[in-house]
Swiss-Prot record:
Species whose genome carries this gene: Mus musculus (Mouse)
GO MF: guanyl-nucleotide exchange factor activity; identical protein binding; translation initiation factor activity
Entry's family note: Belongs to the eIF-2B alpha/beta/delta subunits family.
GO CC annotations on file: cytoplasm; cytosol; eukaryotic translation initiation factor 2B complex; membrane; plasma membrane
Quaternary organization: Component of the translation initiation factor 2B (eIF2B) complex which is a heterodecamer of two sets of five different subunits: alpha, beta, gamma, delta and epsilon. Subunits alpha, beta and delta comprise a regulatory subcomplex and subunits epsilon and gamma comprise a catalytic subcomplex. Within the complex, the hexameric regulatory complex resides at the center, with the two heterodimeric catalytic subcomplexes bound on opposite sides.
Gene assigned in the entry: Eif2b1
Function in brief: Acts as a component of the translation initiation factor 2B (eIF2B) complex, which catalyzes the exchange of GDP for GTP on eukaryotic initiation factor 2 (eIF2) gamma subunit. Its guanine nucleotide exchange factor activity is repressed when bound to eIF2 complex phosphorylated on the alpha subunit, thereby limiting the amount of methionyl-initiator methionine tRNA available to the ribosome and consequently global translation is repressed.
Keywords in alphabetical order: Acetylation, Cytoplasm, Initiation factor, Protein biosynthesis
Protein name: Translation initiation factor eIF2B subunit alpha
N6-acetyllysine PTM sites in chain numbering: K35
BP-aspect Gene Ontology terms: cytoplasmic translational initiation; oligodendrocyte development; T cell receptor signaling pathway; translational initiation
Main location: cytoplasm
Any Pfam family: IF-2B
Activity-regulation annotation: Activated by the chemical integrated stress response (ISR) inhibitor ISRIB which stimulates guanine nucleotide exchange factor activity for both phosphorylated and unphosphorylated eIF2.
C-alpha cells in the first residue's frame, strides 16, 4: 500500500463507523496493510509496518493511535521466530492480527460491565468532552434501569461536550452542559466524576482532552471519586511527571505540527490534551479489570514484554 492509499483507507474506516475509535481504525488499517504487503522477509515486513504506523500518526497524532499500533505490532510479532517459512509466518501473523482486533472490539463492553455497578440510583455524574467509552458505560447504566443525571463540560475548543450531551439526550438521560470554567462550581453538586482517556501512562496517570487535569484537581479537593475508563490498547510507554514532559506530537493536532514545520510558532497554539497525575485518580476501569493507578505499570509491562 502506498502512503496515499494507506491514509485513504484509514479515513474511510473512520467515516464508515463514527463510533469507532481512531486507534481501532488504525489497527484495522495496519491489518489490511499486512495482508497486502509484498515484502519477502520478516525484517522488511516489520520495517514496513513500523513506517505505516508512523504515517498514520502523521494523520492522527493521538496517543491511542501510537500505542495501539505499537501493541498490534508487538502482538503479531510474538510468533515470528517460531516459523522459518515466511509465507507460513505471515499467515500466522495475519491470524494473530485478526484475533487482536476481535479482542479490542470487545473492550468497551467489558469496561461498561465493570463500571456501571459503581453508578448508584440517583447519582449525579460529572464528565468531560466526548468519550465513546464513557458513553458506553452510561448506556449500560440506562439498560440496568438506573436513574441518574449528567453534568458535562462544553469542552473547548471543539465543543465536543455538546456532542456528548446530544448522545445522552437520545438515551433520555437528564443532561446539563456547563462551562469549562464552571468545573469548581459544579463539583459540589456531583457525586462522582467519570472520564475517558486518550492514553494511560506508565505511572498510572492519564493523557486526555485539555481540562481533565483541572477537573481531577477539583474532585480531589472536594473528596469526590475520579474514575477513568480506558481500553488497554491505550496503555502507552511514556512516563511524564508534568505537563512539559508530554511530547508535542501528542499535545497538538497533526495539522498544527505540520504548520510548525513551515515556520509557525507552537507557543501561539493551545494544547489539545493535558496530563493528570495518578495521585488524583481513584480507579481505572479497563478491559483487563479494575485497577488502582499503582497497578498500571505491572499490566503495562505484561502488554509490552
Amino acid at each position: 500500500m502506498e502512503d496515499g492509499e494507506l491514509i485513504e483507507y484509514f479515513k474511510s474506516q473512520m467515516k464508515g463507523d463514527p463510533k469507532m475509535a481512531s486507534a481501532v481504525a488504525a489497527i484495522q488499517t495496519l491489518l489490511e496493510f499486512l495482508k497486502r504487503d509484498k515484502g519477502e522477509t520478516l525484517q522488511g515486513l516489520r520495517a514496513n509496518l513500523t513506517y505505516a504506523i508512523k504515517t498514520l500518526c502523521g494523520v492522527d497524532s493521538s496517543v491511542a493511535v501510537s500505542s495501539g499500533g505499537e501493541l498490534f505490532l508487538r502482538f503479531i510479532s510474538l510468533t515470528s521466530l517460531e516459523y522459518s517459512d515466511y509465507s507460513k509466518c505471515k499467515k500466522i501473523m495475519i491470524e494473530r492480527g485478526e484475533l487482536f482486533l476481535r479482542r479490542i472490539s470487545l473492550s468497551r463492553n467489558k469496561i461498561a460491565n465493570l463500571c456501571h455497578t459503581f453508578i448508584k440510583d440517583g447519582a449525579r455524574i460529572l464528565t468531560h468532552a466526548y468519550s465513546r467509552v464513557v458513553l458506553r458505560v452510561l448506556e449500560e447504566a440506562v439498560a440496568a434501569k438506573k436513574r441518574f443525571s449528567v453534568y458535562i463540560t462544553e469542552s473547548q475548543p471543539d465543543l465536543s461536550g455538546k456532542k456528548m450531551a446530544k448522545a445522552l439526550s437520545h438515551l433520555n438521560v437528564p443532561v446539563t452542559v456547563v462551562l469549562d470554567a464552571a468545573v469548581g462550581y459544579i463539583m459540589e453538586k456531583a457525586d462522582l466524576v467519570i472520564v475517558g482517556a486518550e492514553g494511560v501512562v506508565e505511572n498510572g496517570g492519564i493523557i486526555n482532552k485539555i481540562g481533565t487535569n483541572q477537573m481531577a484537581v477539583c474532585a480531589k479537593a472536594q473528596n469526590k471519586p475520579f474514575y477513568v475508563v480506558a481500553e488497554s490498547f491505550k496503555f502507552v510507554r511514556l512516563f511524564p511527571l508534568n505537563q512539559e514532559d508530554v511530547p508535542d506530537k501528542f499535545k497538538y493536532k497533526a495539522d498544527t505540527l505540520k504548520s510548525v514545520q513551515t515556520g509557525q510558532d507552537l507557543k501561539e497554539e493551545h494544547p489539545w490534551v493535558d496530563y493528570t497525575s495518578p495521585s488524583l485518580i481513584t480507579l481505572l476501569f479497563t478491559d483487563l479489570g479494575v485497577l488502582t493507578p499503582s497497578a498500571v505499570s505491572d499490566e503495562l509491562i505484561k502488554l509490552y514484554l
